[in-house]
C-alpha cells in the first residue's frame, strides 16, 4: 500500500553568473556525479532528481513554483557549490511549501595540497556559500534540516535518507484523509483536537462517516471473497477451525473486506473506530483493523484521529525497514523495584508488524461494545530499541511527546490475556520517564515503533513546525520542566 518510489526529491545547486560558463559547467558536472552516486545507493527510498544549476532570483523562484505544483516532489535538497548570494533566494524560499534539507558538503573530500590554486578555491566555495545560505534561512525563520559532511560519508547518507522518509510521510499526509467511524469516546480529553488546525499544520484532512454505511457494506460482502480471505488467514496465521471461532473470524473477514473497500474509495490513509458507536456491525473491528494496519493504514481506537495519523506517518517513514509500527496503549505496569516495566496492549487493535512470532487468531468475549465475541490476532511483541510517541492538542499548538524505550522479552506466559502485547522499559528509567510523560501531557494512546528512532520524529516535528519534547537516556527532569515552561512562552509568542 505504501510506495516511497512514487516520490522524488529535487536537488538544487546554487551558484551565480559571476563565475562564468566554464566554472558553471564544472559545477553542474560535479553535482551530477554526486546525484548519480546517491541514486546508486539503496539506502535512499526515492529518486533524487538533479535540476539545472540555479544562478538568478527568477530561476530560483521558478523552480520552487514547480516543486510546489508537483505532487511527486516530496522535498528539496539545496547545496551551494559556489557562493550564491542569498537575497536571490528570498522570493523562492518564501513560497516554498515542501520540506527542505540543506546539505553542507563539497565535491572533493580532501584539499589537494600540492595543486590547490585560486581556480580550485573559486570552484569549491560551499564553506562560505552554505554559510550565506544558512543565514537567509535563519533570517526568514524557515524550518529546514541541516546535514553536514562529505556526501560519500555513511552518516551523511543515513541522515539524508531518514529525512527523505520523513518528507514522504509529510507528502502522504497531505494527499490522503483520515476516516472516522463515529466520534471520540465520550468524556475523554486527550483524544480530542482541532481538526482544522491539524489540516493546516499537519496536512491531515479528517472527516467522519456514519458507521451504518460500513455496516451495510459488511452485509453485502460476497461469500466467495470471505473464503478467499480465510485461505490467506490460514497461510499467514495460526488459525482455529472450530465452529465457534470460524463464525467470528468470518465476520471479521467481512468487516475487513468492507473496510478496505471504503478506505480505498475515500483515498484514506488512516481511520478510527469507537466501541460506543457500532450500529449494526456484528463485532467491534479487531482482526480486521490489525490486518489493515499491517497493510500500512494508520489506526486510532476510540476516535483518536491524532494517533491514527501519527501511526500512518511512522509507517510511511519505516516502509521497507526492519521492525514495525502499531497503535498502542500504556495498559498496566510491572513495578518490581529496579525492573519497572510497561505492558503495552489494547483491547484488540495491535498491529502484527511488531509481532515476535507467528500470530494466533483467537476469539474471546469482549465486555464492552455490546456485540458478539470478536476475533483478534494475539502475539508477543518484538524485542529491541523502540520509540513511543504521542501527539496532543495543547490549545494553541500541537505537541509531540517522544519516549525512547527498550522492548524486552516477555519471560512469563499470560495464558488468560486475550490480546497482543509488548513489554518495554522506558528510558532513562520508569519513574523519570513516566514523570516527564505526565508533565508533558502525553496521551495514553501512542504510536509504538521498532522501525524508526527518535531522529525521524524530530525531523517530522521540525519540518511541520510543531512543538516536540524528547524523553530519553539524557533526560534531566528539572531541565525538562524548564523546557516545558520555555516552550509555553515561545509557542505563545510565535505567529503562525
UniProtKB/Swiss-Prot annotation:
<dbReference type="GO" id="GO:0008733">
    <property type="term" value="F:L-arabinose isomerase activity"/>
</dbReference>
<dbReference type="InterPro" id="IPR055389">
    <property type="entry name" value="AraA_N"/>
</dbReference>
<dbReference type="InterPro" id="IPR009015">
    <property type="entry name" value="Fucose_isomerase_N/cen_sf"/>
</dbReference>
<dbReference type="InterPro" id="IPR003762">
    <property type="entry name" value="Lara_isomerase"/>
</dbReference>
<dbReference type="InterPro" id="IPR055390">
    <property type="entry name" value="AraA_central"/>
</dbReference>
<keyword id="KW-0119">Carbohydrate metabolism</keyword>
<keyword id="KW-0054">Arabinose catabolism</keyword>
<keyword id="KW-0413">Isomerase</keyword>
<feature type="binding site">
    <location>
        <position position="329"/>
    </location>
    <ligand>
        <name>Mn(2+)</name>
    </ligand>
</feature>
<dbReference type="InterPro" id="IPR004216">
    <property type="entry name" value="Fuc/Ara_isomerase_C"/>
</dbReference>
<comment type="pathway">
    <text>Carbohydrate degradation; L-arabinose degradation via L-ribulose; D-xylulose 5-phosphate from L-arabinose (bacterial route): step 1/3.</text>
</comment>
<dbReference type="GO" id="GO:0019569">
    <property type="term" value="P:L-arabinose catabolic process to xylulose 5-phosphate"/>
</dbReference>
<dbReference type="Pfam" id="PF11762">
    <property type="entry name" value="Arabinose_Iso_C"/>
</dbReference>
<dbReference type="InterPro" id="IPR038583">
    <property type="entry name" value="AraA_N_sf"/>
</dbReference>
<feature type="binding site">
    <location>
        <position position="302"/>
    </location>
    <ligand>
        <name>Mn(2+)</name>
    </ligand>
</feature>
<keyword id="KW-0479">Metal-binding</keyword>
<comment type="similarity">
    <text>Belongs to the arabinose isomerase family.</text>
</comment>
<dbReference type="InterPro" id="IPR024664">
    <property type="entry name" value="Ara_Isoase_C"/>
</dbReference>
<feature type="binding site">
    <location>
        <position position="346"/>
    </location>
    <ligand>
        <name>Mn(2+)</name>
    </ligand>
</feature>
<protein>
    <recommendedName>
        <fullName>L-arabinose isomerase</fullName>
        <ecNumber>5.3.1.4</ecNumber>
    </recommendedName>
</protein>
<dbReference type="Pfam" id="PF02610">
    <property type="entry name" value="AraA_N"/>
</dbReference>
<dbReference type="Pfam" id="PF24856">
    <property type="entry name" value="AraA_central"/>
</dbReference>
<dbReference type="GO" id="GO:0005829">
    <property type="term" value="C:cytosol"/>
</dbReference>
<feature type="binding site">
    <location>
        <position position="445"/>
    </location>
    <ligand>
        <name>Mn(2+)</name>
    </ligand>
</feature>
<keyword id="KW-0464">Manganese</keyword>
<comment type="function">
    <text>Catalyzes the conversion of L-arabinose to L-ribulose.</text>
</comment>
<dbReference type="GO" id="GO:0030145">
    <property type="term" value="F:manganese ion binding"/>
</dbReference>
Amino acid at each position: 500500500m505504501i510506495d516511497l518510489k512514487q516520490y522524488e526529491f529535487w536537488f538544487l545547486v546554487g551558484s551565480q553568473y559571476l563565475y562564468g560558463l566554464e566554472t558553471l559547467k564544472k559545477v553542474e558536472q560535479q553535482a551530477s556525479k554526486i546525484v548519480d552516486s546517491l541514486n546508486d545507493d539503496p539506502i535512499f527510498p526515492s529518486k533524487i532528481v538533479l535540476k539545472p544549476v540555479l544562478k538568478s532570483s527568477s530561476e530560483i523562484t521558478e523552480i520552487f513554483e514547480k516543486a510546489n505544483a508537483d505532487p511527486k516532489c516530496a522535498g528539496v535538497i539545496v547545496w551551494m557549490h559556489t557562493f550564491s548570494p542569498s537575497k536571490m533566494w528570498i522570493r523562492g524560499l518564501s513560497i516554498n511549501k515542501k520540506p527542505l534539507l540543506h546539505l553542507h558538503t563539497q565535491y572533493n573530500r580532501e584539499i589537494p595540497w600540492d595543486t590547490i590554486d585560486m581556480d580550485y578555491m573559486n570552484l569549491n566555495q560551499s564553506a562560505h556559500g552554505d554559510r550565506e545560505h544558512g543565514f537567509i534561512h535563519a533570517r526568514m525563520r524557515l524550518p529546514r534540516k541541516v546535514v553536514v559532511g562529505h556526501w560519500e560519508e555513511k552518516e551523511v547518507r543515513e541522515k539524508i535518507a531518514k529525512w527523505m522518509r520523513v518528507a514522504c510521510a509529510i507528502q502522504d499526509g497531505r494527499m490522503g484523509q483520515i476516516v472516522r467511524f463515529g466520534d471520540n469516546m465520550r468524556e475523554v480529553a486527550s483524544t480530542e483536537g482541532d481538526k482544522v488546525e491539524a489540516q493546516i499544520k499537519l496536512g491531515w484532512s479528517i472527516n467522519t462517516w456514519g458507521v451504518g454505511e460500513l455496516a451495510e457494506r459488511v452485509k453485502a460482502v460476497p461469500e466467495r471473497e470471505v473464503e478467499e480471505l480465510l485461505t490467506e488467514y490460514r497461510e499467514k496465521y495460526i488459525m482455529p477451525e472450530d465452529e465457534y471461532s470460524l463464525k467470528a473470524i468470518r465476520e471479521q473477514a467481512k468487516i475487513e473486506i468492507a473496510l478496505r473497500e471504503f478506505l480505498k474509495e475515500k483515498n484514506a490513509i488512516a481511520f478510527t473506530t469507537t466501541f460506543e458507536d457500532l450500529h449494526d456491525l456484528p463485532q467491534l473491528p479487531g482482526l480486521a483493523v490489525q490486518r489493515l494496519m499491517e497493510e500500512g493504514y494508520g489506526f486510532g481506537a476510540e476516535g483518536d484521529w491524532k494517533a491514527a495519523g501519527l501511526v500512518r506517518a511512522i509507517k510511511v517513514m519505516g516502509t521497507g525497514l526492519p521492525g514495525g509500527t502499531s497503535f498502542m496503549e500504556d495498559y498496566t505496569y510491572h513495578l518490581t523495584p529496579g525492573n519497572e516495566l510497561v505492558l503495552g496492549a489494547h483491547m484488540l487493535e495491535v498491529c502484527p508488524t511488531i509481532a515476535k512470532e507467528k500470530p494466533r487468531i483467537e476469539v474471546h468475549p469482549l465486555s464492552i461494545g455490546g456485540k458478539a465475541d470478536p476475533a483478534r490476532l494475539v502475539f508477543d511483541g518484538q524485542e529491541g530499541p523502540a520509540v513511543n510517541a504521542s501527539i496532543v492538542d495543547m490549545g494553541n499548538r500541537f505537541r509531540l511527546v517522544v519516549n525512547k524505550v527498550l522492548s524486552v522479552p516477555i519471560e512469563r506466559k499470560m495464558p488468560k490475556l486475550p490480546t497482543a502485547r509488548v513489554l518495554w522499559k522506558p528510558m532513562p528509567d520508569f519513574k523519570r520517564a513516566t514523570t516527564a510523560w505526565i508533565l508533558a501531557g502525553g496521551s495514553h494512546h501512542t504510536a509504538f515503533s521498532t522501525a524508526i528512532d527518535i531522529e525521524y520524529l524530530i525531523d517530522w516535528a521540525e519540518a511541520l513546525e510543531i512543538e516536540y519534547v524528547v524523553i530519553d537516556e539524557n533526560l534531566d527532569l528539572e531541565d525538562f520542566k524548564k523546557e516545558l515552561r520555555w516552550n509555553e512562552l515561545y509557542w505563545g509568542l510565535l505567529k503562525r
